[in-house]
Amino acid sequence: MQAPPPEHCPGVESEQAGQVSACAGCPNQSICSDPNKKREDPGKALVAAALKDVKHKLLILSGKGGVGKSTVTTLLTRYLARSYPDSNFGVLDIDICGPSQPRLMGALGENVHQSGSGWSPVGIDDNVCLMSIGFLLGSVDDAIIWRGPKKNGMIRQFLSEVDWGNLDLLLLDTPPGTSDEHLSVVSYLKDDSSPDSVHAIIVTTPQEVALLDVRKEINFCKKQQIPIVGVIENMSGFQCGHCGHSSEIFPAKTGGAAAMCAEMEVPLLGSLPLDPAIAKACDAGEDITSVKNPTTEALEGICSKIMSSFN
């Protein structure tokens, strides 16, 4: 049996495993530093066992913060759950320092309960459940000031110790960029024997400052050999509710997501407008996907493409 890793452990799969100062005195140092021994995190087997009844895993990524990735995750989940009532969906919020899903899903103040089979995720609807570190905080204003290894440990717990049950799709709301959290979740979910073990959707806005970082996110997925279902362009335009005039709040100076997707050879799933009603509903934790409007019309096509990609 291996001992628990030290606080600043670089990770057993890291090239620095067993070689940095944090490794000094660790009982596992000789194991990690031996190039002849396979460096595979023992937690990976626990994750695989815990998620054996989860058919598909979908990372929701964004290169830039503020593009509405968490809002898009919520909208996708709610629309999918409404459109496929016989399927079960889960949401895992792994934005450890900025958990948004409890508010967006209308679950603020809910508690996570421990059972014999692990943590029980919070039920949102009959076929939707949610897990977030936001449920474990004493107050919504509590700051989480953790280094990478502690975040990674929390992600491993969420993946291996939550009783997700039978899910058709688990959506993972990630922080922006390509940080420790992304490397950690990919290492746990990726199965080399099954290339389709985890997929990704990337969220952007039309302006070049967001697209620059999305290109990096696409390259990250390609290097990690994660199939990209497609890109969603959020806040693509605003239609006045009074006169019907459309305005580009974030002008696409370089062609927007469509041009970038053509350049990077990835699918464009669709575009979502900037809608004040959606923002208001998300702040209140309300489901607005049953109301027919430009956003839900766009979601219909996007969600159909997502589900088709798994068949």
From Swiss-Prot:
The primary site where this protein sits is cytoplasm
How are cofactors bound according to the entry's free-text note?
Binds 4 [4Fe-4S] clusters per heterotetramer. Contains two stable clusters in the N-termini of Nubp1 and two labile, bridging clusters between subunits of the Nubp1-Nubp2 heterotetramer.
Check the record and name the InterPro entries matching this protein: Mrp/NBP35_ATP-bd, NUBP1/Nbp35, P-loop_NTPase, YlxH/NBP35
- What is the similarity comment for this entry? Belongs to the Mrp/NBP35 ATP-binding proteins family. NUBP1/NBP35 subfamily.
Cofactor(s), names only, from the UniProt record: [4Fe-4S] cluster
UniProt keywords, alphabetically: 4Fe-4S, ATP-binding, Cytoplasm, Iron, Iron-sulfur, Metal-binding, Nucleotide-binding
Q: Which organism is it from?
A: Drosophila pseudoobscura pseudoobscura
Q: A GO molecular function for this record?
A: 4 iron, 4 sulfur cluster binding
Known function: Component of the cytosolic iron-sulfur (Fe/S) protein assembly (CIA) machinery. Required for maturation of extramitochondrial Fe-S proteins. The Nubp1-Nubp2 heterotetramer forms a Fe-S scaffold complex, mediating the de novo assembly of an Fe-S cluster and its transfer to target apoproteins.
Q: How does it assemble?
A: Heterotetramer of 2 Nubp1 and 2 Nubp2 chains.
Q: What is this protein called?
A: Cytosolic Fe-S cluster assembly factor Nubp1 homolog
This protein's source sits in the domain of life called Eukaryota
A cellular-component GO term for this protein: cytosol
Where in this chain does the entry annotate a coiled-coil region?
none
